[in-house]
């Protein structure tokens, strides 16, 4: 075998008249009777190679036996394509390789699905079972090239700005951080378990106490939680922590890094500073703590109608301290039938809304199921509040504020997709700040941390921890991109007494706090610097930069929605001997 001189996808006009050695997979083969054309593929792309008896009769005979996905090595000379055969769709489309020698390195059975088609209409489970074949597709090859470019850009930025890449343990202690832990039984310590880290949160804080000042890690994290399209049980996080900083320092660093990544990976200049919005404003205007700002259709408070109208649903809602909000779908009145509106009503029911009221704005007023409840003065109020015009569709939810936000926020996204309102070329970054420190868990009847127990409250709110914990704001911030939470961070608690107080508010006894977090509380006794950080979801960032809609497309060997690996059949049963060594017994 000869040494490869270049990749297939890099053979351009600069190689004209040069002899090259290429290695790759047969992407496509066309026998034109006397001439055989093969598209040869590798990770960089495709180049057309030609088998011509005038060039090599022996090579032509071998080419007659090759089939799709055979692995071959070819030698030949790069020539200019005839004008009528130039392919402007690919980088190598101006040239072809006249083959003088071919060697079949390995044969292939017929794949279970086509690899040489751009849009593979095949069940995802089949693709995941044969993931090594799926990854040969150019679409996915490009995705993972961009993933590499993304991580390279991140490392370059952090290295150039004085950060140390430090690894933290994978086998650690189970602590209550939100989701369920993946547990690993210890053979040496019978009946005891390690946990796989949900994040390196505590270790990166300990590194700040150790004096390392600037830390980063591109790290695997594990969470045993219910899955959806943008979640995986194991995922990659860009984890960053800094000492002697405030929120502004971390936001500035995060923006600089993300602008560099977008420039390096997509060649796009993103202007800064990124817009900011408080948590309260995001929920009020968009019904979401991760608003997609690529389009309008904001939530509008129309609770005034509940006071003016003789419509029992609206009136009762306002009388019971609820609220009424509306969204306006411009020029959509004729695009949704009553049956469509029934389907939208069922959609908001998922989010706890009892119903979806709606009217269509027409030239002489309103039409629709609740139009009869609107008197002329109410119509004018509605138009003033919503700026609705004839042809618009106005939808209302009247309920508790959190139900209104969740249901209309989700409906807003659904309608925008259906109506084609989203400019997919945009990258809209947004910081969401001033989060509540705590949330009240109705089931547990206690407060839980909105982010995690180590987030510091705003200094001016510390005294409220005892009297009105629901009104304490956190030194926390999320970075949002196109309606997805890209990452989040906070300034951490660095005072042992305040951390102990936080545990008390969360319902921990002193003994429980010491048992679970004693090592952190002890570390605070030895001079902890002020510190804070941020963690970005790498898989999600790549998904958004590559315009994918499924997180699994950005992970080489992902799990399914039920947390299984169809390629390896993990998780799987283990032998009785292995269970005995771990002092475990399975109960069915």
From Swiss-Prot:
Q: Where is this region: Aspartate?
A: 201-204
Q: Which InterPro entries match?
A: Aa-tRNA-synt_II, aa-tRNA-synth_II, aa-tRNA-synth_II/BPL/LPL, Asp-tRNA-ligase_1, Asp-tRNA-ligase_1_N, Asp/Asn-tRNA-synth_IIb, AspRS_core, GAD-like_sf
| Listed PROSITE patterns | AA_TRNA_LIGASE_II
Q: What is its EC number?
A: 6.1.1.12
Sorted keywords for this record are: Aminoacyl-tRNA synthetase, ATP-binding, Cytoplasm, Ligase, Nucleotide-binding, Protein biosynthesis
Q: Which residues bind L-aspartate?
A: 177, 223, 451, 492
Looking at the UniProt record for this protein, which Gene Ontology cellular component terms does it annotate, in alphabetical order?
Answer: cytoplasm
One Pfam family, please name it: tRNA_anti-codon
Give GO MF terms, alphabetically. aspartate-tRNA ligase activity; ATP binding; catalytic activity, acting on a protein; nucleic acid binding; transferase activity
Question: Which reaction does this chain catalyze?
Answer: tRNA(Asp) + L-aspartate + ATP = L-aspartyl-tRNA(Asp) + AMP + diphosphate
Give, as one word, the top-level EC class: ligase
- Which one GO biological process term can you cite for this protein? aspartyl-tRNA aminoacylation
Segment forming the signal sequence: none
Which residues hold ATP?
A: 223-225, 232, 485, 537-540
Q: Where in the cell is it found?
A: Cytoplasm
Q: What does this protein do?
A: Catalyzes the attachment of L-aspartate to tRNA(Asp) in a two-step reaction: L-aspartate is first activated by ATP to form Asp-AMP and then transferred to the acceptor end of tRNA(Asp).
**Which PANTHER family would you find in this protein's record?**
ASPARTATE--TRNA LIGASE, MITOCHONDRIAL, ASPARTYL/LYSYL-TRNA SYNTHETASE
Q: Which family does it belong to?
A: Belongs to the class-II aminoacyl-tRNA synthetase family. Type 1 subfamily.
- Assembly mode: Homodimer.
Query: Which NCBIfam families does this one have?
Result: aspS_bact, PRK00476.1
Q: In its UniProt entry, what is this protein called?
A: Aspartate--tRNA ligase
Organism of provenance: Staphylococcus epidermidis (strain ATCC 35984 / DSM 28319 / BCRC 17069 / CCUG 31568 / BM 3577 / RP62A)
């Amino acid at each position: 075998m000869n040494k490869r001189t270049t990749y297939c996808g890099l053979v351009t006009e600069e190689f004209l008249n040069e002899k090259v050695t290429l290695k790759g997979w047969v992407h496509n083969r066309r026998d034109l009777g006397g001439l055989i054309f093969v598209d040869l593929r590798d990770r960089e792309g495709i180049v057309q190679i030609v088998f011509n008896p005038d060039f090599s009769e022996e090579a032509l005979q071998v080419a007659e036996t090759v089939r799709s996905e055979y692995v071959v090595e070819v030698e030949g000379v790069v020539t200019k394509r005839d004008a009528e055969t130039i392919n402007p769709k690919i980088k190598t489309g101006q040239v072809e390789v006249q083959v003088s020698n071919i060697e079949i390195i390995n044969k292939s059975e017929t794949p279970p699905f086509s690899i040489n088609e751009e849009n593979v209409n095949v069940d995802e489970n089949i693709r995941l079972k044969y993931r090594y074949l799926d990854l040969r597709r150019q679409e996915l090859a490009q995705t993972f090239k961009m993933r590499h470019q993304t991580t390279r850009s991140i490392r370059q930025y952090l290295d150039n700005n004085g950060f140390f890449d430090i690894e933290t343990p994978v086998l650690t202690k189970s602590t209550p951080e939100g989701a369920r832990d993946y547990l690993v039984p210890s053979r040496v310590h019978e009946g005891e378990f390690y946990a796989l880290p949900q994040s390196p949160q505590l270790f990166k804080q300990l590194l700040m106490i150790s004096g390392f000042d600037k830390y980063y890690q591109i790290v695997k994290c594990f969470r045993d939680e219910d899955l959806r399209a943008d979640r995986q049980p194991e995922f990659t996080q860009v984890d960053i922590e800094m000492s002697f900083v405030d929120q502004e320092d971390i936001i500035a660093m995060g923006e600089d890094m993300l602008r560099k990544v977008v420039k390096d990976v997509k060649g796009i200049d993103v202007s800064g500073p990124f817009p900011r919005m408080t948590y309260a404003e995001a929920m009020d205007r968009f019904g979401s703590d991760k608003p997609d700002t690529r389009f309008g259709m904001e939530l509008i408070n129309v609770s005034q109608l509940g006071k003016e109208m003789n419509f029992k649903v609206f009136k009762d809602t306002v009388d019971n301290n609820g609220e009424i909000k509306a969204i306006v779908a411009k020029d959509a009145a004729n695009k949704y039938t009553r049956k469509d509106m029934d389907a939208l009503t069922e959609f908001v029911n998922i989010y706890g809304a009892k119903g979806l009221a709606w009217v269509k704005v027409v030239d002489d007023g309103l039409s629709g199921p609740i139009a009869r409840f609107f008197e002329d003065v109410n119509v004018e109020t509605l138009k003033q509040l919503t700026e609705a015009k004839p042809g618009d569709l106005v939808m209302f939810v009247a309920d508790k504020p959190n139900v209104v936000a969740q249901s209309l926020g989700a409906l807003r996204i659904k309608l925008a997709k259906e109506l084609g309102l989203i400019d997919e070329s945009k990258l809209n970054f947004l910081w969401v700040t001033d989060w509540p420190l705590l949330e009240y868990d109705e089931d547990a009847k206690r407060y839980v941390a909105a982010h995690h127990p180590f987030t510091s409250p705003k200094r001016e709110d510390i005294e409220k921890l005892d009297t009105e914990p629901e009104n304490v704001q956190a030194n926390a911030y999320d970075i949002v991109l196109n309606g997805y939470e890209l990452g989040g961070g906070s300034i951490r608690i660095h005072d042992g007494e305040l951390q102990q107080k936080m545990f008390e508010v969360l319902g921990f006894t002193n003994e429980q706090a010491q048992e679970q977090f004693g090592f952190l509380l002890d570390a605070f006794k030895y001079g902890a610097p002020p510190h804070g950080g941020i963690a970005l979801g790498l898989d999600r960032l790549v998904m958004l930069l590559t315009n994918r809609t499924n997180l699994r497309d950005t992970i080489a060997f992902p799990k399914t929605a039920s947390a299984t690996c169809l390629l390896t059949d993990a998780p799987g049963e283990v032998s009785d001997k292995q269970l005995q060594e771990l002092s475990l017994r399975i109960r069915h």
